[in-house]
Each structure stands twice: as C-alpha cells, then as structure tokens.
C-alpha cells in the first residue's frame, strides 16, 4: 500500500468526503503491526457557515489543529467516552475537516478485536468511537499527519457516484440541514443512528 500524496487532500472539504470513500486508512504500530480499514462513511465540517463545527465561532487552543495543513489528524475526546478521528482539509489558516465515521476492517483484525473486546466483525469499526478504539487512536495522535509513516491513507479504486449515499449528519443539533454525510450504500460497516435529512444517492 502506497500513501496518497499531499495533493490528494488539497481540495474542498465536501469533495474530500467523497474522495476518501473506499480508500484505506493505515496505522503502523511501534511493534510493526499494521492496522488497516477501508473508509466507508465520512462527514464534512467547515469553519465558515457550519454551526456544528468546532471552529465556527473562533480559533481556540482546542481547534487549532483544524487550521493546519490538509492531511493533518484532528483527534478530540467527546461525550466523556470516545475519541473522534478527523482529517484536516482546506488551505492552511482556513478551518475544515472530514470526520471518519466508519471503516471496514482489512488488516490487524485480531488486534482490533482485543481493543474492542468483541469478535463481531461488522461491529469492529462501524462508528467513529468504535474505529478509534480499534485503531488505538487517542489524544496523543492529535496533530500527527498522514505523511510521517505511522499513519497514511492508501489509494484504492474510486467509488462510483451511484454507490455513494448522502444525508444530513448524525448526532448533531445545529446545521442539521446540510447534506454533508457521505457513505458507501449497502456496506454493512456503515454506522447506524439518527440521521438528519433525507438519505439518497448522488445520482
């Protein structure tokens, strides 16, 4: 698996939510174990015009990472229980990020099962909190990049537009009308939960 170049991430946040679908997120642990998952669900968050985005009101120490180079990891703790994995987008100094909502496990399955304390395959990474637990992603990963060797996204065939679903984002109370959740339709690893807006294909 070869890492995607920096140029891949140099696009709008909305475009990146679709481009990332089907690509492989990889983490190489210090002991050499490789963990990999196919990205099957994403959500866009923008600093401008999006009240659900952490950077909507202002730049703060907490959201500072969102203003960095596209391809930087923005990891935060939420609900007192889960870490969320985001990939920074947009040009530097303009906040934006793609939340990785779900993956399909590809490599390192046994490690993931131990991390998640479950052997149920479809349940290993079928949600943003589940996938970070499976990948052992925590606060120390915040600010890392996809270009330093430990983390990267590998290329894979693009998902045809008629196989991409779109809907409102899950688990938010503001800007719910924005159709910025993208997912591979029919994939068993896409997360559940209450959806804001209508689910449809992009065709």
Swiss-Prot record:
Alphabetical keyword list: DNA damage, DNA repair, Hydrolase
UniProt-listed Enzyme Commission number(s): 3.2.2.-
BP terms from Gene Ontology: base-excision repair
Disulphide bridges, residue numbers: none
Family stated for the protein in its record: Belongs to the DNA glycosylase MPG family.
Family annotation (PANTHER family): DNA-3-METHYLADENINE GLYCOSYLASE
Protein name from the UniProt record: Putative 3-methyladenine DNA glycosylase
Species this protein is from: Chlorobium chlorochromatii (strain CaD3)
């Amino acid at each position: 698996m070869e890492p995607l170049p920096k140029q891949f991430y140099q696009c709008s946040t909305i475009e990146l939510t679709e481009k990332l679908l089907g690509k492989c997120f990889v983490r190489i642990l210090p002991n050499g174990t490789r963990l990999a998952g196919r990205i099957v669900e994403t959500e866009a968050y923008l600093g401008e015009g999006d009240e659900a985005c952490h950077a909507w009101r202002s730049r703060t120490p907490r959201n500072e990472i969102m203003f960095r180079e596209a391809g930087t990891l923005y990891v935060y703790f939420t609900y007192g229980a889960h870490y969320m994995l985001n990939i920074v987008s947009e040009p530097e100094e303009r906040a934006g990020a793609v939340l990785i909502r779900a993956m399909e496990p590809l490599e390192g399955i046994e490690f993931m099962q131990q991390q998640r304390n479950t052997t149920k395959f479809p349940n290993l990474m079928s949600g943003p909190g589940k996938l970070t637990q499976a990948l052992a992603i925590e606060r120390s990963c915040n600010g890392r990049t996809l270009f330093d060797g430990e983390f990267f996204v590998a290329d894979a065939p693009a998902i045809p537009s008629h196989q991409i679903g779109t809907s409102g984002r899950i688990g938010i109370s503001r800007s719910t009308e924005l159709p910025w959740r993208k997912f591979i339709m029919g994939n068993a690893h896409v997360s559940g939960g209450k959806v804001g807006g209508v689910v449809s294909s992009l065709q």
